[in-house]
Design a protein with these regions (language model features):
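Conserved ABC transporter NBD signature motif
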Residues: 50-61
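The feature captures the beta-strand-to-loop junction immediately N-terminal to the Walker
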Residues: 27-29
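Helix-to-loop junction immediately C-terminal to a conserved catalytic motif
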Residues: 42
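Conserved signature/switch motifs of ABC ATPase nucleotide-binding domains
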Residues: 120-123, 141
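Short coil-to-helix segment of the ABC ATPase nucleotide-binding domain corresponding to the Q-loop/switch region
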Residues: 79-88
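Catalytic Walker B motif of ABC-type/P-loop ATPase nucleotide-binding domains
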Residues: 146-149
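Conserved ABC ATPase "signature" region
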Residues: 97-117, 169
């Protein structure tokens, strides 16, 4: 897959296969095309070459089978918490009756800890609360793929930790397929099953994939105390350092006990 505008190629030859129910994170420097790739998967942009295949079918337009959570709290400002979630759920499950829709929406409001705030408009919510609404709305639609575009980038550190924990809980309960792009290495290790490492752009490439073998459900403190956690973090940080714009040589220094693989396949 290649994406570019005019003479600029953002990334090239990205082949990534994601199994159903996997949580995959993509890490790389700014400008490597992470968000562009996510937008292509979402159907919001088109690649100059290649294709996205979902369940054996090529996709090139937005759809309810892919829900995106952006970092900019993309809620409808004139609607309440309940209404923002209800609108998406009703579109996805038009055949449900009113009571079933209501109970289902309330379930996800409770799941993200917003019970009692369902009638508030986005302007009355903190950044963390707004992003909780976005996550609840995305999970509630039951998409085939949930796309997270640095969803916690604009949230303070303490709130970010709490919402990451809620995201782990929701993923455990739903087993959604998730593709997330992030600059936060610790976040990627904690949340994901595999971490795709991108070289620096322009003409960025998918260099390798790090397998994160921690069992689920995960408890933050226990995971961060594991020797393997430190090894994976060191490996990825070294990769990013070696692939900074100031360094011409690519590729991370192999780390003992870190399982990596070259990208294969071409499906999402």
């Amino acid at each position: 897959m290649e994406a570019g505008g005019g003479s600029l190629c953002v990334f090239k030859d990205v082949r990534l296969h994601i199994d159903k129910g996997q949580f995959v994170a993509m890490v790389g420097h700014s400008g490597c095309g992470k968000s562009t790739l996510l937008n292509i998967i979402a159907g919001l942009e088109q690649p100059s070459e290649g294709a996205i295949i979902l369940d054996g079918k090529e996709i090139d337009t937005p759809g309810l089978d892919r829900m995106v959570v952006f970092q900019n709290f993309s809620l409808l400002p004139w609607m309440s918490v309940y209404e923002n979630i209800h609108l998406a759920v009703k579109a996805a499950f038009a055949q449900w009756d009113r009571k079933r829709l209501h109970d289902y929406v309330q379930r996800y409001i409770h799941m993200v800890g917003l019970a009692g705030s369902e009638h508030k408009k986005p302007a009355a919510l903190s950044g963390g609360m707004r992003q909780r609404v976005g996550l609840a709305r995305a999970f509630a639609v039951q998409p085939k793929v949930l796309l997270l575009d640095e969803p916690f980038a604009q949230i303070d550190a303490l709130t970010r930790v709490n919402i990451q924990d809620e995201l782990m809980h929701m993923w455990t309960a739903t087993q959604n397929t998730v593709f997330m792009v992030t600059h936060d290495v610790e976040e990627a290790i904690l949340l994901s099953d595999r971490i795709a490492l991108m070289t620096s752009g322009p003409e960025a490439e998918l260099a390798e994939i790090v397998d994160v073998g921690f069992p689920r459900p995960r408890i933050r403190e226990q995971v961060m105390d594991l020797p393997e956690y430190s090894r994976i973090k060191k490996y990825i940080m070294q990769f990013l350092k070696n692939n900074s714009r100031e360094v011409s040589a690519g590729g991370a220094v192999p780390g003992a006990g870190v399982l990596v693989s070259k990208p294969v396949g071409a499906e999402a």
